[in-house]
Swiss-Prot record:
Positions bearing N6-(retinylidene)lysine: 296
Protein name as annotated: Rhodopsin
One function term, GO molecular function aspect: G protein-coupled photoreceptor activity
Glycan attachment points: 2, 15, 200
Positions in the Cytoplasmic compartment: 62-73, 134-152, 225-252, 309-353
Stretches for region Disordered: 331-353
Extracellular compartment segments: 1-36, 97-110, 174-202, 275-286
Topological category with respect to the lipid bilayer: Multi-pass membrane protein
Organism phylogeny: Eukaryota, Metazoa, Chordata, Craniata, Vertebrata
């Protein structure tokens, strides 16, 4: 084995020299240069500095503007709440432990950090799935005379929390476990060992099938059907320039959604799966650290893509930031009037508001 396994930890270094120490008790500077921990802490501080304001602003603006408090926007609020879970439950903890060079908060802290980081990430992931399904149902109308209402939105929210807990809670009760990973200053699911009594193998397979592959397939299916629906609508009005513009906007939006989903989660999932299927193989601490912390940046991508590109929300946000007056209101109003013909396509396909 090209690593050192101990009680509730796995350090990716062979302990031939005897320098490997528990990541709960000693700095791990023998793994990487201490400057790397400083850079990691600075990166987490940047995510907090950007992620908290943009997600908090999302909640505040929605509460302040009644027209944003619609069933279709509930899932976007859920997305912001999930991102705040990651900011407070994961990012602050990781920044603090990075400053010390090891997981100074101990085993209990590892469970708490791993749980909240996983919970926030899974809520965000399943929120995107529910959003994709909602867009598909509203735009493509597979169910005739269906109207998306408040009860459907609440059921969607409950579903995201149920699925997130189904992934984040089992390691707390003995089905797998949370251990320090990468540079040993943040915690995640144990992909690394086959420790007796934890059934890591079955949990990792369950997680990859139910909490990655299935969501990815659903997102691709729903947005693929949405693109087809928009193209069909545009083909029926080929003489309309505004409709063609709406088609391009929706195409760009969907591509950004899918690419962001893959950019955030595919590297982490791929590396985790490789480690799981090649347990005992040699890999460095940075090998898992980079994709893990890149996935955390989804707390910034999510509100920017799914909310800030919403024209109605952007209008309300500018109004809030400018103390009740939108200096671009007249310009946006004229632009909106010129796009009346395409509103049925763009409002139902691009913007969830």
């Amino acid at each position: 084995m090209n690593g050192t396994e101990g009680p509730y930890f796995y350090v990716p270094m062979v302990n031939t020299s005897g320098i490997v120490r528990s990541p709960y008790e000693y700095p791990q500077y023998y793994l990487v240069n201490p400057a790397a921990y400083a850079r990691l802490g600075a990166y987490m501080f940047l995510l907090i500095l950007v992620g908290f304001p943009i997600n908090f602003l999302t909640l505040y603006v929605t509460i302040e503007h009644k027209k944003l408090r619609t069933p279709l926007n509930y899932i976007l609020l859920n997305l912001a709440v999930a991102d705040l879970f990651m900011v407070f439950g994961g990012f602050t903890t990781t920044m603090y432990t990075s400053m010390h060079g090891y997981f100074v908060l101990g085993r209990l802290g590892c469970n708490i950090e791993g749980f909240f980081a996983t919970l926030g990430g899974e809520i965000a992931l399943w929120s995107l799935v529910v959003l994709a399904i909602e867009r598909w149902v509203v735009v493509c109308k597979p169910i005739s005379n269906f109207r998306f209402g408040e009860n459907h939105a609440i059921m969607g929210l409950a579903f995201t929390w149920l699925m997130a807990l189904a992934c984040a809670a089992p390691p707390l009760v003995g089905w797998s476990r949370y251990i320090p990973e990468g540079m040993q200053c943040s915690c995640g699911i144990d992909y690394y060992t086959r420790a007796e009594g934890f059934n890591n193998e079955s949990f990792v397979i369950y997680m990859f099938v139910c909490h990655f592959t299935v969501p990815l397939m659903v997102v691709f299916f729903c947005y693929g059907r949405l693109l087809c629906a928009v193209k069909e609508a545009a083909a029926a009005q080929q003489e309309s320039e505004t409709t063609q513009r709406a088609e391009r906007e929706v195409t760009r939006m969907v591509i950004m959604m899918v690419v962001a989903f893959l950019v955030c989660w595919l590297p982490y999932a791929s590396v985790a799966w490789w480690i799981f299927t090649h347990q005992g193989s040699e890999f460095g601490p940075v090998f898992m650290t980079i994709p893990a912390f890149f996935a955390k940046s989804s707390s910034i991508y999510n509100p920017m893509i799914y909310i800030c590109l919403n024209k109605q929300f952007r209008h309300c946000m500018i109004t809030t930031l400018c103390c009740g007056k939108n200096p671009f209101e007249e310009e946006e109003g004229a632009s909106t009037a010129s796009k009346t013909e395409a509103s049925s396509v763009s409002s139902s396909s691009v913007s969830p508001a």
